[in-house]
Amino acid sequence: MGKYRTFRLAAIQAAPVFFDLDASTRKACRLIAEAGKQGATIAAFSETWLPGYPFFVWGSSKDPQLQWKAAADYLANSAEIPGPTTDQLCKAAKKARIDVVIGMVERDKDSQGTVYCTLLFIGREG
């Protein structure tokens, strides 16, 4: 086997600010900066980190009104790609000189409510 490039991975073990895309994005940017300062070359967040994925969103709740409100909040806090959320994440990755992998709920700009579980990869160039 040949030589392989080594890397330092920051596995982000932090919760987002559920149903608050803006606050979660700011938190992600802080965590990206911290990972870069600690020498990581890749920061990896979990699936649907933005805006989080509370288990009750799609039916675990016994209260239908709460379930519908949670689903509406979930949709409202999803992000279009590209958009302001990805712009902020790209700037943070570039400033920290770190690759970023983050799971996010992507809202389809051409539909009324379609979302995708997207894994976004941002290079250290932003």
Question: What are these regions, as identified by a protein language model?
Answer:
Residues 21, 30-124:
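Cys-nucleophile CN-hydrolase/nitrilase-fold catalytic domain and related Cys-dependent amidase chemistry
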Residues 13-30:
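N-terminal phosphate-binding loop and adjacent alpha-helix
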Residues 6-16, 118:
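Active-site-proximal beta-strand elements of phosphoester/diester hydrolases
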Residues 1-3:
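Eukaryotic N-terminal low-complexity, Ser/Thr- and Lys/Arg-rich leader segments
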